[in-house]
Amino acid sequence: MNFGRVNPAQTLDAQGITGLGEVHYNLIEPALVEAAVTRGEGRLGRGGAFLCSTGAFTGRSPKDKFVVRTPSVEDTIWWENNAPMDPAAFDRLHADMLEHMKGRTYFVQDLFAGADPELRLDVRMVTELAWHGLFIRHMLRRPERAELDSFVPDWTVINCPSFKADPERHGCRTDTVIVLNFERKLILIANTEYAGENKKSVFTLLNYILPGKGVMAMHCSANHALGDTDDAAVFFGLSGTGKTTLSADPSRTLIGDDEHGWSDRGTFNFEGGCYAKTINLSAEAEPEIYATTSKFATVVENMVYDEETLELDFNDDSLTANTRCAYPLDYISNASESGLGGHPKNVIMLTCDAFGVLPPIARLTPAQAMYHFLSGFTSKVAGTERGVTEPQPTFSTCFGAPFMPRRPEVYGKLLQEKIAKHGATCWLVNTGWTGGAYGTGKRMPIKATRALLTAALDGSLSGVQFRRDPNFGFEVPVDLHGVDAKLLDPRSTWADPAAYDQQAKKLVEMFANNFAQYVPFIDADVKAAAIG
């Protein structure tokens, strides 16, 4: 039995997904919250937020993600980074999932992935959990109600947490699986309730399709100056490095917090919402994000709360350090309605340095920017992936290796071309540790990071004196009014400068060893900018 608004020629039955119980198409937020609460998927929290737990999976499962190895993508997928699945195994998985789904209730959301109408994908999300429908309705872009009558999905995502895959039969690693089939235009997700898999599977899809159209797909946040869409900035970074926090700046308009494209027309958000980390979130440091946690229909994921008062405990990481909330962009007062911006004037690469070696900000040449983009040095922050309980130094190329289906040089060369064509200034910003490594030093003060970023974005930082860093070759400001000058010289923040030198040497060697894999594919200017 079908409920809701849908193109009558594009029901699930018409797609060959038959025999289901109730199917609810394109329910709006109140109906999805009502369904989720009624079905016992979670609780109504303060202000009407939806409080839920994702069970055993509180982060992504990157080792359980696959791409079906079909002729059309055989030569363009980066197979060293993307596990292949045999087409026959996929067909068995798909058939078994559809059989499992029969008689059960499902929720369908027809949504746009991409704010640029010429480049967007029309995506259908089929979810077993009502709150997953609510989550993805926040995260992607919502069509007008009338547009649903003619909506034809380009791609379909089926998420069925109650289905367990069979590794032997389905060609996967465990009973959890996330698999993309570019020939069938189909994504299957099984045996995980972690909502982030929904959005990141669509992101992976766009990261494959858009570069083929000359569009740079980016794991970044973006904003622009108030009233000036041409003064745009993008912030690359892995989960937990500060993309959401640092782009939510009251003095600038937020384009988006996580996934964007850079086309010949400028930047555009892939999404229509935000997925913010909430661990240690405070009303003082991040008032707008904090306020969303008690707004109607915000999805509050894996946060501990008082059973009687429903008060959230922002400091409790007993379920996971990866506590999050998902909300529509219009819950942020200065968010862009269009999701569009001009060509970035500033490109910022965020890193969370657990070694405590890198300065809080450094100016990069275009070649150095390409080097750091391909290197993607950061630290995996606790909770964003299963099993990560403390920061782990890592190199994640393009600041998002788990979501990059193509070889890194494809994205690197696209970015290099965009930076050169539009004259963007590039910066490396360390939101990690200072005064010592993780466990000894302390996190970089967010107040200092914000002050340095503000100066970079308004152009005033370019007017101060810079020094050349002896280890990494980039330029570091010597001082900036309002920022402790010691912070700008990481060596001086360490109690033992010799220990800093030893740590810096170790990090330089790690950079050099990691970058060796890209040397055959890069131009001479980037080779010259290489460290070590």
Curated annotation (Swiss-Prot):
Chain residues that bind substrate: 60, 194, 200, 324
InterPro entries membership: PEP_carboxykinase_ATP (IPR001272), PEP_carboxykinase_C (IPR013035), PEP_carboxykinase_N (IPR008210)
Gene Ontology process terms (BP): gluconeogenesis
Cofactor note: Binds 1 Mn(2+) ion per subunit.
Binding of ATP, residues: 200, 219, 237-245, 286, 324, 449
Main location: cytoplasm
Intrachain disulfide bonds: none
Co-factor(s): Mn(2+)
Residue positions binding Mn(2+): 200, 219, 258
Matching Pfam families: PEPCK_ATP
GO-annotated molecular function: ATP binding; metal ion binding; phosphoenolpyruvate carboxykinase (ATP) activity
The keyword Transport is assigned to this record: no
Subcellular localization: Cytoplasm
An example Gene Ontology CC term for this record: cytosol
Keywords from the UniProt entry: ATP-binding, Cytoplasm, Decarboxylase, Gluconeogenesis, Lyase, Manganese, Metal-binding, Nucleotide-binding
Enzyme Commission number(s): 4.1.1.49
Pathway(s) this gene product operates in, as recorded in its UniProt entry: Carbohydrate biosynthesis; gluconeogenesis
Annotated NCBIfam families: pckA (TIGR00224), PRK09344.1-2 (NF006820), PRK09344.1-3 (NF006821), PRK09344.1-4 (NF006822)
Similarity comment: family membership: Belongs to the phosphoenolpyruvate carboxykinase (ATP) family.
HAMAP family, per database record: PEPCK_ATP
Protein known as: Phosphoenolpyruvate carboxykinase (ATP)
Taxonomic placement: Bacteria, Pseudomonadati, Pseudomonadota, Alphaproteobacteria, Rhodobacterales
